[in-house]
Amino acid sequence: MEGLQPVRSLFTRFFQLEAASGLLLIAAAVLALIINNSPLSYLYGGLLEVPVAVQVGALNIAKPLLLWINDGLMALFFLLIGLEVKREVVDGHLSKPSQVILPATAAVGGMVVPALIYWFINRDNPAAVAGWAIPTATDIAFALGVLALLGKRVPVSLKLFLMTLAIIDDLGAIIVIALFYSGTLSSVSLLLAAACLLVLVAMNRLGVIKLGPYMIVGLILWVCVLKSGVHATLAGVALAFCIPLRTRNAESSPLLALEHALHPWVAYAILPIFAFANAGVSLAGMTVDSFTHPVPMGITIGLLLGKTVGVFGLTWVAVKLRLAALPAGAGWGQILGVAILCGIGFTMSLFVGSLAFAPGSSEYAGMDRMGILTGSFFAAVIGYAVTAMASRKTSIA
């Protein structure tokens, strides 16, 4: 049991960080909206378009600041997701099939139903259909943060259900990005990336436990993936899967150490910076028609209704078919509340939206953000209210 203590303390720290960072994410998004709809809007747009170049010998990477944030900083976010997924699969809640069935089933429903709703609303517009994956994402920071506001009124099992569901949802998002949002591929860069991956695997098998060598090869891997046409953030996931969880010295774990070190940076810096850079929607000239356009409407309905129906519906099916049981101490009202909270797409939806509708090159770049912010806001408010009412009834009973 003592060996599980680091994992338990890490989960406690993780939940506290994600809950606290939710308020910072909201503040960053609101600040972006205020600045971009004020006389200072030119500063906001100008800042994100500032060219940043890095050159090492013949290698030159030049991008506007916005893309450095989306391709660079978010690679660290996906590195953290990869570490969490590996830990859960090897030694956590995803290591036991009986514990995976319910959240995995719910996660599948929470991705498929929103995608179908968005596709149905935008089916006559091929350019708009490219955003089908936007409402399939769940922002783990916001969802857990809202649930944390209820404190001890919700059972720990319900929090674990939401966390596991969100991690599986993130894994699904990674697969979607790899399969559907990669550009023209460069065979040379892909071969170099594969070589880096082989080196990382070899280091793992040879028992290398120092994080420094992994980070150096990981940086080279990121550059190769960036140049390959596959989205660069996937390099973070690949690197994470190669970091060893266990060592011959049972008291140390490179994976847990890196995860522990990354959490505050991701929670309090990377995600708020990303939110600030991507949530600045211009409200100038916005009318009711702006919200009823198929793109924002598809995203809003997909997040709010699609996530609820998908997560709650497949959870109900799994329980009724006796494939799994409800989380201990949780009632159906609380499951409904959590299903609604899964509609908080925010950062993950904004990220997928930046791939589907690239800022500056797609007419839907601003529309998708309107749908994401609207759907996420109502999902947070309604989800909190439903979960709070259901928890009160459960505690009274």
Swiss-Prot record:
Keywords noted in UniProt: Antiport, Cell inner membrane, Cell membrane, Ion transport, Membrane, Sodium, Sodium transport, Transmembrane, Transmembrane helix, Transport
UniProt cross-references to PANTHER family, sorted A to Z: NA(+)_H(+) ANTIPORTER NHAA, SODIUM ION/PROTON ANTIPORTER NHAA-RELATED
Mode of membrane association: Multi-pass membrane protein
Cellular location(s): Cell inner membrane
GO CC field: plasma membrane
Catalysed reactions, semicolon-separated: Na(+)(in) + 2 H(+)(out) = Na(+)(out) + 2 H(+)(in)
TM helices/strands, residue ranges: 15-35, 42-62, 65-85, 101-121, 129-149, 160-180, 183-203, 219-241, 265-285, 299-319, 335-355, 370-390
Disulfide bonds: none
UniProt family annotation: Belongs to the NhaA Na(+)/H(+) (TC 2.A.33) antiporter family.
Molecular function via GO: sodium:proton antiporter activity
Function according to Swiss-Prot or TrEMBL: Na(+)/H(+) antiporter that extrudes sodium in exchange for external protons.
UniProt-listed GO biological process terms: regulation of pH
Keyword Amino-acid biosynthesis tagged: no
Naturally occurring in which organism (per UniProt): Pseudomonas putida (strain ATCC 47054 / DSM 6125 / CFBP 8728 / NCIMB 11950 / KT2440)
This protein's name: Na(+)/H(+) antiporter NhaA 1
NCBIfam families named in the record: NhaA, PRK09560.1, PRK09561.1
